[in-house]
Amino acid sequence: MVPENRRKQLAIFVVVTYLLTFYCVYSATKTSVSFLQVTLKLNEGFNLMVLSIFILLNSTLLWQLLTKLLFGELRLIEHEHIFERLPFTIINTLFMSSLFHERYFFTVAFFGLLLLYLKVFHWILKDRLEALLQSINDSTTMKTLIFSRFSFNLVLLAVVDYQIITRCISSIYTNQKSDIESTSLYLIQVMEFTMLLIDLLNLFLQTCLNFWEFYRSQQSLSNENNHIVHGDPTDENTVESDQSQPVLNDDDDDDDDDRQFTGLEGKFMYEKAIDVFTRFLKTALHLSMLIPFRMPMMLLKDVVWDILALYQSGTSLWKIWRNNKQLDDTLVTVTVEQLQNSANDDNICIICMDELIHSPNQQTWKNKNKKPKRLPCGHILHLSCLKNWMERSQTCPICRLPVFDEKGNVVQTTFTSNSDITTQTTVTDSTGIATDQQGFANEVDLLPTRTTSPDIRIVPTQNIDTLAMRTRSTSTPSPTWYTFPLHKTGDNSVGSSRSAYEFLITNSDEKENGIPVKLTIENHEVNSLHGDGGEQIAKKIVIPDKFIQHI
C-alpha cells in the first residue's frame, strides 16, 4: 500500500503536470499562425520537457490501470522481480534508442515505452504461473485452470506481440526503398517483440507441462477412488456404521504402486529441455538479424550472452541425463532379504514417505521406477524419488554425502551390510557344547553408528540388545564398517557356562593405541512358574575403567 503522504504528493504532481501541459499547448497555439508552427514550438525548449513528462506520467498511469485490470494486486515477490530487472532493461533501451537519428525520437520513444511495459507484463505473468500452481487444492479442476485469468493473459499478450510484429513488418515493406534508416528501426523492434513471443512460448510449454502433471494426478486420484469398493455385510448383527466402511480390494501391491502418483518423473529435465529449445531460438534470431542485415554491433553482446546461456543450459541438461542413467545402471537394486538385513528397518523412502517394499514376497516391480536403490552411503530410496532429488542436489538427502565424484561418476560404495559379514568358525564353550558362531553373529546385530556430538561416552552397564535397538531408532548409519578380530580367552573353567572373547577397538587410521574390550556370554538356567526349565543368554561388553572417558 502507498502511504497517505505519498498519495498526496503524487496527486499534486499530476495536477501540476496537467496544468503546465495545458499552458504550453495554449501559449504555442496563441503565438502561432499554423499547425506546423505549433508543432515546432512544442518540440523545443521548456515545452518539450513538459510534454515528455506528460507522456511519461500518462503512460505510467495507463500501465498501472492495465496491471490492475489484468493481474489485480501484485504480490511482494512480483514487485521485487520488477525492480530487480527494470534498471538493466531501461539502460539497454536507452542505448538502443541512441543508435537512431533524432527525427525518429517520438517513434523510438513510443516503441521503447511499449516494449518496456510489455516486458513488465511478461515478468508478472511468469511469476503468476507459480502462484497458480500454489493455489491448486482439492476443489481445483482442469477446467478452472484452463479458463483462469492466467490463461487469458497468456493468450492476450501473445496476440498483442503478434500484432505488433506484423505491423512492424508491414512498415518495413512500405519504407524499404524510401527510408532505409527507418527499416533498421523496425527490424530491431521486430527482433525485440519476437523475443517476447519466444518467452511466451517458453511459458506456454511450461504451463502445458504443469497442467499435464495436474491431469495425471487427477487421473491417479480417480483410479484410486474407483478401486475402493464397499463390502457387503453378511452378519445380521453387523453395526450399520461398520457397513459403510470402505474395503480395499486385495490386489497386487504393484497395482497400488501404479495408481499412486507422486509427481511427474523427469519434470526438471523437461523444463531444462524447454529452456534449451527457447534459448536456441533466441540465439538463432539474433544471428539471423546481426549477419545478413548488418545490424548495429551493440547486438553482439546479446548474441554472446545467448550463446553462453545456451551452452550452460545444454551442459546442465546433458549432466542430468547422464546422472539419471548412472543411477539406474550403477546403483544396486535392493532385494527383500537385503532390506531386512540392512540398518534401514523402517522400510520407508524418506522422499515420498512410501514403503520401499510392500510385500515380503515381492521380487519384481511392474513400475521399474519404484525399485529401491542403495546409495554409496548405504541409504535406500526409490529410483524415481532419487532421480527427482538428484536433479536439484548431488548429495544424499539423509546424510548429505556426495553421490557423484568430480568426474561425474558415482562414487565407490563404502557400505557393507550385516548379511555380508558372517563368521563360519565353530567355538566350543566350557561345557563342551559346540556353538555355531554364524548363528551368534545373527543374534547380536552390531550396527555402525554416527554421532554428531564430540563427547562419546561408553556405558559399561548397558545391555547389548537395548543398545542395538536404540542405535536403530536414533542413529544414522555410517558409510564405513569396521570389523574387529575376536580372540577367545583361556580363563574359562570346565564347569562354567561363560565364554569370553577379547578384541581391540581402534580408530580408522590406527594412529592411536587400541582399547582392549572383552565380550562375555553367560548361560543362566531360568525356572518358570509352571516348572519348565529354560536357558537365558546374557551378553555383556566389559571395558576397563581407565578407558571410560571423553574420546
Curated annotation (Swiss-Prot):
Q: Does the keyword Chaperone apply?
A: no
Cytoplasmic compartment: which residues?
Answer: 1-8, 72-84, 127-147, 209-271, 315-551
Ranges annotated as RING-type zinc finger? 349-400
* Transmembrane parts of this sequence: 9-30, 44-71, 85-101, 104-126, 148-169, 184-208, 272-292, 297-314
Topological domains, Lumenal: 31-43, 102-103, 170-183, 293-296
Q: What catalytic reaction does the record list?
A: S-ubiquitinyl-[E2 ubiquitin-conjugating enzyme]-L-cysteine + [acceptor protein]-L-lysine = [E2 ubiquitin-conjugating enzyme]-L-cysteine + N(6)-ubiquitinyl-[acceptor protein]-L-lysine
Function of the molecule: E3 ubiquitin-protein ligase which accepts ubiquitin specifically from endoplasmic reticulum-associated UBC1 and UBC7 E2 ligases, and transfers it to substrates promoting their degradation. Mediates the degradation of endoplasmic reticulum proteins (ERQC), also called ER-associated degradation (ERAD). Component of the HRD1 ubiquitin ligase complex, which is part of the ERAD-L and ERAD-M pathways responsible for the rapid degradation of soluble lumenal and membrane proteins with misfolded lumenal domains (ERAD-L), or ER-membrane proteins with misfolded transmembrane domains (ERAD-M).
This chain belongs to which protein, by name?
A: ERAD-associated E3 ubiquitin-protein ligase HRD1
Taxonomy of origin reads:
Eukaryota, Fungi, Dikarya, Ascomycota, Saccharomycotina
